[in-house]
């Protein structure tokens, strides 16, 4: 059965009974995570800074019994507190938080504007902290919770011309490890996932903007040891595992999903 077809008659899934907040969840990796979470029995709070066609499509697909869409900018701490309050009001608890919302800021360090620097960190780092800080009191009260930060291979390896995005993603992995240790004894797990090149709508748009889209996609695939580009569902399955009780002894850990690219010294 397709992951995009929600079948309510199935036996309980790996996330049966859990409630998850997933930021940036109307497209790409976030939408794939939301769909798979519901497929595995969770109820989800969808989020984007825009209430657009993509948001309406995912909300309609998952249905009001299984999902709630809240428009909010993760850079706005008060908006994220309100989002968590709405999640509690709708579903009664929050078991899982997936901090997926992010943005690419790729620039030359000396040509980058102050606004670009601030926006990159306000979304890619502070956005995760704003939502985490809002949800932590509820997780601590129930002495259980799984927080999953979607970082990046850029948090491990540096590509010239991508500043300051790798700085923010390195910091996000540091935040993951620090909070994971800080709250481990109180039932909270904090882990991160670092995707490499994943065939999201944004990447497809980037390929389309290239002079020869097919050649560029083939070139990018050839850089990977597995000779193919990753799919959003492949990230989503790892998020399901980390959200589930199967991962109860995994904490303060980052998982790379890049087809082995980051481990390749030379090709």
Regions found by a protein language model. Give the residues of each.
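Residue(s) in the substrate-gating loop at a strand-loop-helix junction
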Residues: 152
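Alpha-helical segment proximal to the catalytic Tyr-Lys
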Residues: 137, 181-185, 248
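Active-site helix of classical SDR
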Residues: 132, 168, 176
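Conserved glycine-rich cofactor-binding loop
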Residues: 19, 26-27
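C-terminal substrate-recognition "lid" of short-chain dehydrogenase/reductases
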Residues: 129, 228-257, 262-263
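Short C-terminal tail/terminal secondary-structure segment
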Residues: 2-12, 157, 240, 251-267
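Substrate-binding pocket helix/loop in short-chain dehydrogenase/reductase
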Residues: 108-109, 113-121, 220
């Amino acid at each position: 059965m397709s992951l995009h077809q929600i079948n309510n008659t199935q036996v309980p899934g790996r996330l049966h009974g859990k409630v998850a907040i997933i930021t940036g969840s109307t497209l790409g990796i976030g939408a794939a995570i939301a769909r798979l979470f519901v497929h595995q029995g969770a109820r989800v709070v969808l989020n984007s800074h825009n209430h657009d066609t993509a948001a309406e499509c995912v909300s309609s697909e998952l249905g009001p019994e299984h999902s709630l869409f809240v428009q909010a900018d993760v850079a706005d701490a008060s908006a994220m507190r309100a989002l968590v309050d709405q999640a509690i009001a709708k579903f009664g608890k929050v078991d899982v938080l997936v901090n997926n919302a992010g943005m690419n800021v790729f620039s030359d360090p000396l040509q980058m504007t102050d606004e670009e620097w601030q926006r990159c960190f306000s979304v890619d780092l502070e956005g995760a902290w704003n939502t985490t800080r809002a949800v932590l009191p509820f997780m601590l009260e129930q002495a259980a919770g799984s927080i999953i930060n979607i970082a990046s291979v850029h948090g491990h390896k540096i590509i010239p011309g991508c500043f300051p995005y790798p700085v923010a993603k390195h910091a996000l992995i540091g935040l993951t490890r620090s909070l994971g240790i800080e709250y481990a004894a109180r039932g909270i797990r904090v882990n991160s996932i670092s995707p490499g090149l994943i065939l999201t709508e944004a990447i497809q748009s980037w390929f389309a903007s290239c002079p020869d889209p097919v050649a560029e996609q083939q070139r990018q695939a050839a850089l990977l040891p597995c000779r193919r580009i990753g799919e959003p569902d492949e990230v989503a399955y790892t998020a399901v595992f980390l959200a589930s009780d199967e991962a109860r002894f995994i904490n303060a850990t980052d998982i790379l999903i890049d087809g082995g690219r980051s481990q390749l010294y030379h090709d």
